[in-house]
Swiss-Prot record:
<feature type="binding site">
    <location>
        <position position="228"/>
    </location>
    <ligand>
        <name>substrate</name>
    </ligand>
</feature>
<feature type="binding site">
    <location>
        <position position="313"/>
    </location>
    <ligand>
        <name>Zn(2+)</name>
    </ligand>
</feature>
<feature type="glycosylation site" description="N-linked (GlcNAc...) asparagine">
    <location>
        <position position="301"/>
    </location>
</feature>
<dbReference type="Pfam" id="PF00149">
    <property type="entry name" value="Metallophos"/>
</dbReference>
<feature type="binding site">
    <location>
        <position position="228"/>
    </location>
    <ligand>
        <name>Zn(2+)</name>
    </ligand>
</feature>
<keyword id="KW-0325">Glycoprotein</keyword>
<feature type="binding site">
    <location>
        <position position="162"/>
    </location>
    <ligand>
        <name>Fe cation</name>
    </ligand>
</feature>
<keyword id="KW-0479">Metal-binding</keyword>
<keyword id="KW-0408">Iron</keyword>
<feature type="binding site">
    <location>
        <position position="352"/>
    </location>
    <ligand>
        <name>Fe cation</name>
    </ligand>
</feature>
<dbReference type="GO" id="GO:0046872">
    <property type="term" value="F:metal ion binding"/>
</dbReference>
<dbReference type="GO" id="GO:0005615">
    <property type="term" value="C:extracellular space"/>
</dbReference>
<feature type="binding site">
    <location>
        <position position="191"/>
    </location>
    <ligand>
        <name>Fe cation</name>
    </ligand>
</feature>
<feature type="binding site">
    <location>
        <begin position="350"/>
        <end position="352"/>
    </location>
    <ligand>
        <name>substrate</name>
    </ligand>
</feature>
<dbReference type="InterPro" id="IPR015914">
    <property type="entry name" value="Purple_acid_Pase_N"/>
</dbReference>
<keyword id="KW-0732">Signal</keyword>
<dbReference type="Pfam" id="PF16656">
    <property type="entry name" value="Pur_ac_phosph_N"/>
</dbReference>
Length: 464
C-alpha cells in the first residue's frame, strides 16, 4: 500500500469513528457522596402548627385549558372542611369552592383525610389567594393562572424528576426555586416520594414528601406523571392495588381530555400542548392508552398551541447502563406517531442522571430491510432524561461506551431544567446542576419549533 492509499484508509477509519461516536460526556466530576434521606424531624418536614392544620397542600391544573385549579391537602385530627375560599388579587370578594375527601389504608398505615377541591372559571393571567382549613386552623396560599392560550404566548416550565426526599432532593428544589428564569409550572416526570423503598412501603414517607414539596407546589402547579415508584404493588404484605397511595393523594384532570385513566392525559397551557403518558400501564395496540393517544395527537392545533411536549417516566433513548432499553417496546409502538405529528421535546426520568439526545428516530426498520439504528431526523423530538432530582438511590454513573451518536450530552449529576418558551418558533432550554450557581447553565440550547420553524438545531449544527 502506497502513502496516499494509506492516508486515505486512515481518513476512512477516522471518519467511521466520528460517525459512530456521539456528543459529549461532561468532564464535570461530582464528588462521590452517599445520598441519604433527610430524617423525619428535619425542618422541611415540619408539621404546621395549630389544631387540624392543613398540610401537604398542592395544586395542579384542573381542566384542559388552564382556567381551573385542583387544590389538595391533608388534615389529620378530624375531617374538617373541604371548602376552599379564594379571591383575586384585585378583589376582596371571597368565593367558595366545594370539594370532597378520601382516605385509604395501606398495610398498617391509615391516611389522614385527603381533600381535593377544584376551583373553576378562573380568569387568565391573574393572581389568586386561597384558604384551606376553614373552621379549624386556616392557612393561606396563592397562585397565578396562566396567560390565555395562544401561539406566541411566552411561558416558563420547570422540569424535575425522581425527586425523593434526600438532602440532595432539598438542594434540587432550592436550586429550582432560586433559578432566575423563574419557572411558572413544574412538569414532573415521575417518582415522587420513594416511600416504597422503606420497610412495608412506609406511607409516612408520602406525608413527609407532601410537606417537603408544599413550599413550591402550593404556589404553582406541578403537572404529574406516574413513575414506577408510585406503583406500590406489594402482594407480600397484602397490597395488590397498584398506585393506591398516588391515586388517592394526587388528582389530575384526565377526564377533561377524554382519558379513561389518571395515568395518561393532556392539558393546554399558554402556548404548549402537554401530553402525559404512562410507562407502566398497558400501551400496546387496542389498549385504552393506545386508543386515546391515537385520537389525541390529531387534535393538537399547532396554530393555537405550537409547542407539543410529551412527558413519560421511562426514557426511550438512554445511553446509561441503568434501565437500558427498558422503554424500547413503548418506543416501537409510538415513535412513528411522534415523528408524524412533529413532537418538539420528550421529557423522561427513571435514570438517575441527565442526558439530552439529538433529534433522532428509529422508525425505518422492517423485517426486510434490516435497518435498525437511530438516524438524524428533523421531524423527531429531542429526548431529555431528567431523572436527576436527588433520590436516595443515588446517581447512575455507568455509561455505555463509546457514547452513541444519538446522545448529544450526558452527565451523572443531580439538578433540574428550565424550558422557556419565547414564541411560536423559539424556546430556550437549560439544565442546571446542583453544584453550580443558580444562573449557571451546564447544558443549554435554543429549541426551534418543529411545526413553525423546523430548522436543524442539532448540537453539531448549533454551537453548544
Amino acid at each position: 500500500m502506497g502513502v496516499v492509499e494509506g492516508l486515505l484508509a486512515l481518513a476512512l477509519v477516522l471518519s467511521a469513528c466520528v460517525m459512530c461516536n456521539g456528543g459529549s460526556s461532561s468532564p464535570f466530576i461530582r464528588k462521590v457522596e452517599k445520598t441519604v434521606d433527610m430524617p423525619l424531624d428535619s425542618d422541611v418536614f415540619a408539621v404546621p402548627p395549630g389544631y387540624n392544620a392543613p398540610q401537604q397542600v398542592h395544586i395542579t391544573q384542573g381542566d384542559l385549558v388552564g382556567k381551573a385549579v385542583i387544590v389538595s391537602w391533608v388534615t389529620v385530627d378530624e375531617p374538617g372542611s373541604s371548602e376552599v375560599h379564594y379571591w383575586s388579587e384585585n378583589s376582596d370578594k371571597k368565593k367558595i369552592a366545594e370539594g370532597k375527601l378520601v382516605t385509604y389504608r395501606f398495610f398498617n398505615y391509615s391516611s389522614g383525610f385527603i381533600h381535593h377541591t377544584t376551583i373553576r372559571n378562573l380568569e387568565y393571567k391573574t393572581k389568586y389567594y386561597y384558604e384551606v382549613g376553614l373552621g379549624n386552623t386556616t392557612r393561606q396560599f396563592w397562585f397565578v393562572t396562566p396567560p390565555e392560550i395562544g401561539p406566541d404566548v411566552p411561558y416558563t416550565f420547570g422540569l424535575i424528576g425522581d425527586l425523593g426526599q434526600s438532602f440532595d432532593s432539598n438542594k434540587t428544589l432550592s436550586h429550582y426555586e432560586l433559578n432566575p428564569r423563574k419557572g411558572q409550572t413544574v412538569l414532573f416526570v415521575g417518582d415522587l416520594s420513594y416511600a416504597d423503598n422503606y420497610p412495608n412501603h412506609d406511607n409516612i414517607r408520602w406525608d413527609s414528601w407532601g410537606r417537603f414539596t408544599e413550599r413550591s407546589v402550593a404556589y404553582q402547579p406541578w403537572i404529574w406523571t406516574a413513575g414506577n415508584h408510585e406503583n406500590h404493588f406489594a402482594p407480600e404484605i397484602g397490597e395488590t392495588v397498584p398506585f393506591k397511595p398516588y391515586t388517592h393523594r394526587y388528582h389530575v384532570p384526565y377526564k377533561a381530555s377524554q382519558s379513561t385513566s389518571p395515568f395518561w392525559y393532556s392539558i393546554k397551557r399558554a402556548s404548549a400542548h402537554i401530553i402525559v403518558l404512562a410507562s407502566y400501564s398497558a400501551y400496546g395496540k387496542y389498549t385504552p392508552q393506545y386508543k386515546w393517544l391515537e385520537k389525541e395527537l390529531p387534535k393538537v392545533n399547532r396554530t393555537e398551541t405550537p409547542w407539543l411536549i410529551v412527558l413519560m417516566h421511562s426514557p426511550w433513548y438512554n445511553s446509561y447502563n441503568y434501565h437500558y432499553m427498558e422503554g424500547e417496546t413503548m418506543r416501537v409502538m409510538y415513535e412513528p406517531w411522534f415523528v408524524q405529528y412533529k413532537v418538539d421535546v420528550v421529557f423522561a426520568g427513571h435514570v438517575h442522571a441527565y442526558e439530552r439526545s439529538e433529534r433522532v428516530s428509529n422508525v425505518a426498520y422492517n423485517i426486510v430491510n434490516g435497518l435498525c439504528a437511530p438516524v438524524n431526523d428533523k421531524s423527531a423530538p429531542v429526548y431529555i432524561t431528567i431523572g436527576d432530582g436527588g433520590t436516595l438511590e443515588g446517581l447512575a454513573t455507568n455509561m455505555t461506551e463509546p457514547q452513541p451518536k444519538y446522545s448529544a450530552f450526558r452527565e451523572a449529576s443531580f439538578g433540574h431544567a428550565i424550558f422557556d418558551i419565547t414564541n411560536r418558533t423559539h424556546a430556550h432550554y437549560s439544565w442546571h446542576r446542583n453544584q453550580d450557581g443558580v444562573a449557571v447553565e451546564a447544558d443549554s440550547l435554543w429549541s426551534f419549533n418543529r411545526y413553525w420553524h423546523p430548522v436543524d438545531d442539532s448540537t453539531a449544527h448549533v454551537s453548544h
